[in-house]
A protein has these predicted regions:
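Helix-loop boundary and gating motifs at the non-cytosolic
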Residues: 5-60, 220-250
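A late C-terminal transmembrane helix in Major Facilitator Superfamily
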Residues: 324-367
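C-terminal transmembrane helical hairpin of 12-TM major facilitator-type secondary transporters
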Residues: 272-316
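Glycine-rich segments within core transmembrane alpha-helices of 12-TM secondary carriers
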Residues: 144-168, 336-349
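Symmetry-related core transmembrane helices of the 12-TM Major Facilitator Superfamily/SLC fold
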Residues: 177-196, 375-398
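Cytoplasmic helix-loop-helix junction between adjacent transmembrane helices
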Residues: 116-155
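Central cavity-lining transmembrane alpha-helices of secondary-active solute carriers
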Residues: 54-73, 252-262
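C-terminal ends and interior cores of transmembrane alpha-helices
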Residues: 88-107, 280-294
Length: 406
C-alpha cells in the first residue's frame, strides 16, 4: 500500500474495537489536558516558565522508562491486566498531588513535580504500548491490522485538540481546579472500556528476557524517529504559546480535514507528497502566525497546523509499519508513539524555556492561558520545520525506499 488509500472493512468496527478506540481517546485526552493545566497551576504558584518547561518535558523522558519491560510483562501476565494496571497508575498520577494539596494542604516542591511527571510518562508509555500496539491487534484479523493501527492512532491524535478544549470548557463553566479530577475521570473511563473487552489467554514464550526492544523500539527505524521528533518539536512549540478556545477548536477542525484529505486528496498521490505537503502546511501556519489579524491567528493558523500534523502523522505511522519485519508491528507502532510524543513534549518544553518572561505580559494567575502570541518562539519552529523538510526530502525518504520491507 504505497498510497493512503487504506481499505475500510466494516466488520472491523465491532463493539470491542470501538471500546479500545475510545479508551485510547479518553486516555490521551486526559494527558493532553495537562498542556494547559500544568502551566496554569505552576504559574499560579509562582514558578518560572523554564520550570514549567522542565516539568512538561519530564513526561517525554518517562515514556521510555518501562518500554523495555513491555514484552516481558505482556507475556508473563495477561496483557489486558498490564494495560489496566498502567491506566490505573496514570489515573492516580493525575489526582494524587491535587488531592494532597486540596484536602491535606500538603505542598510539593519542583523536584516532586518533575518526578511525578516522569512516573506519569512511564505508565502512560506502558499503557499505550499494550493498548495501541498489542490489544488492538488482538481484536482484529491479520489482514485488518494496518487499518486498525491507522484508526486507533487517529483517535489518539485528536486528543491534541480535545484535551485543551475540555480544559477551556472547564475554565469557562466551572473552575480550573477541576482539571485534574476530570483528567482522573477520563483515565478511569479508559480503564472501564478496556476492562469490558474480552481477550483470549495466550501462553507465554519459553524464553522471556526481562528487558528487550520487542514491542518497545525499532532500531532500524532511527532515521524515521529523528525526523518525526524534529517535525513534532517544531509543531509542539506552538502549544507553549497561550491560545483561546477558538484556536483549539480550529485545530480539531484541521485534524478532521486531514482525515478527509487522506481519503480523497492523497488516496493515489505520490508516496513522498503527503509528508512534504504536511511540512509545507506547518511552515505556512508558522509564517501566518507572524500576522496580527485575529482571523489569521485564531482560525487559519490552527487549521493549517492540524491539517499538517494529521497528514504527517498517518504517513509516518505507515512508514514505520512497512519498515518493520515479521512480528514487529507492535514494535513499530510503539516507536512511532514514542517519537510523536517525545517531539511534541520537547517542543512544548523548549517553548516555555524560550519564553521565560511570557507570564509577565498580563498580570494575574490567568496570564499563562490568556497571553497573546509570542512571535519569538515561531522563528526556532520555522527553522526546525525547514530542517525537517530538507532531512526528509534528501535523506529519510530515499533511505526508507531502500530499506522498507512491505
Amino acid at each position: 500500500m504505497d498510497t493512503q488509500n487504506t481499505p475500510i472493512h466494516v466488520n472491523l468496527w465491532h463493539r470491542d474495537f470501538w471500546r479500545l478506540c475510545f479508551a485510547n481517546l479518553l486516555l490521551m485526552t486526559s494527558v493532553y489536558m495537562l498542556i494547559l493545566g500544568i502551566p496554569y497551576f505552576m504559574t499560579k504558584e509562582g514558578y518560572r516558565p523554564w520550570q514549567v518547561g522542565v516539568v512538561v518535558g519530564a513526561y517525554g523522558l518517562g515514556i521510555f522508562l518501562l518500554g523495555g519491560f513491555c514484552s516481558y510483562l505482556v507475556q508473563r501476565y495477561r496483557r489486558n491486566r498490564v494495560c489496566q494496571f498502567s491506566i490505573c497508575c496514570v489515573a492516580v498520577c493525575h489526582v494524587v498531588l491535587y488531592y494532597l494539596d486540596t484536602f491535606w494542604n500538603i505542598k510539593f516542591g519542583f523536584e516532586v513535580l518533575v518526578a511525578m511527571r516522569v512516573v506519569l510518562g512511564a505508565f502512560l508509555g506502558l499503557a499505550q504500548m499494550t493498548l495501541a500496539s498489542t490489544l488492538v491487534i488482538d481484536t482484529c484479523e491479520s489482514f485488518q491490522r494496518t487499518e486498525a493501527n491507522y484508526i486507533t492512532s487517529w483517535f489518539a491524535r485528536f486528543s491534541i485538540a480535545t484535551g485543551p478544549v475540555l480544559v477551556w470548557l472547564i475554565c469557562t463553566f466551572f473552575n480550573m481546579r477541576l482539571t485534574f479530577p476530570v483528567a482522573f475521570l477520563l483515565a478511569l473511563g479508559a480503564l472501564v472500556l478496556v476492562s469490558r473487552v474480552k481477550f483470549p489467554f495466550k501462553a507465554p514464550a519459553d524464553h522471556m528476557p526481562l528487558f528487550s526492544s520487542d514491542r518497545f523500539f525499532l532500531p532500524q527505524g532511527i532515521p524515521l524517529f529523528v525526523n518525526i521528533v524534529l517535525i513534532m518539536a517544531s509543531a509542539g512549540m506552538y502549544f507553549a504559546i497561550p491560545h483561546n478556545l477558538t484556536v483549539y477548536l480550529m485545530l480539531l477542525a484541521g485534524l478532521v480535514v486531514a482525515v478527509i484529505a487522506e481519503k480523497y486528496v492523497f488516496a493515489d498521490a505520490d508516496l513522498k507528497s503527503q509528508v512534504v505537503v504536511g511540512l509545507i502546511l506547518i511552515g505556512a501556519a508558522e509564517f501566518v502566525s507572524l500576522n496580527d489579524q485575529d482571523f489569521a491567528v485564531e482560525v487559519l493558523v490552527p487549521v493549517l497546523l492540524g491539517l499538517g500534523m494529521g497528514v504527517i502523522g498517518s504517513r509516518f505511522l505507515l512508514f514505520y509499519i512497512k519498515l518493520a519485519k515479521h512480528c514487529q508491528r507492535g514494535t513499530s507502532t510503539s516507536s512511532f508513539f514514542l517519537a510523536w510524543e517525545l517531539g511534541i513534549t520537547l517542543g512544548i518544553a523548549l517553548g516555555f524555556v524560550l519564553q521565560d518572561s511570557a507570564c509577565q505580559h498580563l498580570p494575574g494567575e490567568h496570564s499563562v492561558i490568556f497571553n497573546s502570541t509570542i512571535h519569538e518562539l515561531l522563528y526556532p519552529g520555522m527553522i526546525l520545520t525547514g530542517l525537517s523538510l530538507i532531512l526528509y526530502n534528501f535523506l529519510v525518504h530515499p533511505w526508507y525506499m531502500k530499506h522498507r520491507n512491505r
